[in-house]
């Protein structure tokens, strides 16, 4: 297992019971089930995936699954149980976020093929809605490294979250520069969270999580290897999590251009850092700019285009303003002295599930802190 022993608190789904979540996880493990077929199952079974799990082959075919996928469902049923996989994720402190959860990344939710299930290690925060993807070649030049470090450092200091794919080259430089500048960064994997790829970036992945500055995200279950076909799908998530995509350095056939293509399809901004016309490493990004991508000479070119000058003020306001009555009730009960969740349930009169999910949201927003032992305090 490559998952690290970070000091992270495990949160179940904020929108469903653990039993229900287990069946979402189970179907997400079935080879052949993607966002479209997953939605077909939800529609056919009216969100009751436990019923789908117990259905026979004929009924699953009526729900829209192919014969091969149905065979994969039947095979998985004989080798594992939904509850067993959920227990494994809990032991590893991996959080599962579904499309039904309030904490599902809002920008990613907007895309047509949003993954129904996300596996995360580390913590997403309210500030991560202000994110920019930074992508490029795995074989970067000195120029590519220098300009990426410069732009990302300035973005991170402006509290822009940096999203990339944890690959070698530009991805590694982007993640590292964000961390060095004290900023946040999200690494999107094309494999399960128990398999850090490439292996040489295990230290970087560990640093992202253990520093509290980053989070690892994937749509792939534990054990899934980084097969070639997974990377384009991974790239759509990189773009989907972001307000825009910056291509730092890329040759004509770079995978970074696939990410830029997803961004355009998703209605997001695309930026490029101009490179030498004599360098093959910049031919892809130069063509991208020629075709209409915004050229970036300095960080203000990005901040102005995305209106990101006021991030600190916006995050501060979001962190202290309750969004609903449940948050208002709990905010009145929580002080700078630790308060146990049982006391909050008793004093608020709210249901246990409501208190649990609301506390999760309040912590993600930076309103409160979990201090261990199911106790909470105000964050400020």
What is each of the regions a protein language model found here?
Residues 2-20, 98-380:
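Glycine-biased, small-residue-rich flexible motifs in mid-sequence functional cores and linkers
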Residues 2-102, 367, 372-380:
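Short, small/acidic-rich helices and loops at N termini and domain boundaries
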């Amino acid at each position: 297992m490559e998952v690290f022993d970070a000091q992270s608190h495990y949160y179940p789904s904020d929108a469903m019971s653990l039993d229900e979540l287990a069946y979402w996880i189970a179907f997400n493990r079935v080879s052949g089930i993607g966002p479209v077929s997953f939605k077909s199952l939800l529609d056919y079974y009216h969100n009751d995936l436990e019923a789908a799990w117990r259905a026979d082959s004929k009924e699953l075919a009526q729900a829209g699954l192919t014969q091969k996928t149905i065979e994969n469902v039947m095979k998985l049923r004989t080798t594992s149980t939904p509850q067993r996989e959920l227990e494994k994720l809990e032991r590893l402190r991996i959080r599962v976020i579904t499309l039904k959860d309030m904490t599902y990344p809002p920008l990613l939710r907007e895309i047509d093929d949003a993954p129904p299930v996300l596996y995360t290690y580390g913590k997403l925060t309210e500030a991560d809605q202000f994110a920019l993807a930074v992508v490029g070649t795995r074989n970067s030049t000195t120029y590519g490294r220098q300009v990426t470090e410069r732009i990302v450092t300035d973005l991170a200091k402006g509290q822009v979250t940096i999203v990339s794919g944890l690959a070698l080259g530009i991805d590694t430089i982007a993640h590292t520069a964000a961390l060095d500048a004290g900023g946040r960064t999200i690494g999107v994997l094309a494999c399960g969270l128990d398999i850090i790829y490439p292996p040489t970036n295990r230290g970087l992945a560990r640093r992202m999580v253990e520093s509290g500055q980053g989070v690892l995200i994937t749509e792939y279950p534990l054990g899934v290897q980084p097969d070639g076909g997974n990377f384009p799908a991974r790239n759509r998530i990189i773009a989907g999590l972001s307000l825009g995509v910056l291509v730092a350095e890329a040759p004509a056939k770079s995978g970074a251009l696939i990410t830029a293509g997803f961004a355009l399809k998703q209605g997001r901004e695309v930026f490029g850092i101009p490179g030498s016309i004599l360098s093959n490493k910049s031919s892809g990004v130069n063509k991208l700019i020629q075709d209409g991508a915004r050229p970036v000479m300095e960080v203000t070119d990005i901040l102005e285009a995305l209106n990101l000058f006021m991030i600190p003020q916006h995050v501060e306001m979001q962190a202290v303003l309750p969004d609903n009555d449940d948050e208002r009730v709990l905010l009145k009960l929580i002080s700078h002295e630790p308060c146990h969740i049982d006391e909050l349930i008793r004093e608020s009169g709210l249901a246990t599930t409501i208190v649990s999910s609301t506390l999760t949201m309040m912590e993600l927003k930076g309103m409160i802190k979990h201090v261990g032992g199911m106790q909470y305090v105000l964050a400020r």
